């Protein structure tokens, strides 16, 4: 039985990759990689995201300057159609991921009751 759970997980992984929303996000990411300006903006977004996660892990908040930089980056992303398309595709895919997470972790939540 324990092997079955891994088989199910692998089937689920393949099913997620087969979703139109996943393929759309993947295509959008490839378009970003092909565009130098969009790629640089995406890399900047990832760096800022990592920095924010580091701050959160240490219980710190971004400074006012960092908040202003984040706001400026957000505006640049909103103005870039490739990035906007990618994040919209990611959002559509996250609906599935959130639902799957809720379903998979339901038994663990039951243990806490």
Swiss-Prot record:
Pfam families listed in its UniProt record: Com_YlbF
InterPro entries: Com_YlbF (IPR010368), YheA/YmcA-like_dom_sf (IPR023378)
SUPFAM superfamilies (alphabetical): YheA/YmcA-like (SSF158622)
Superkingdom of origin organism: Bacteria
HAMAP family assigned: UPF0342
NCBIfam families with a match to the protein in the record: PRK13676.1-1 (NF010209)
Similarity field: Belongs to the UPF0342 family.
Protein name per the record: UPF0342 protein Sez_0866
Species per Swiss-Prot/TrEMBL record: Streptococcus equi subsp. zooepidemicus (strain MGCS10565)
Organism lineage: Bacteria, Bacillati, Bacillota, Bacilli, Lactobacillales
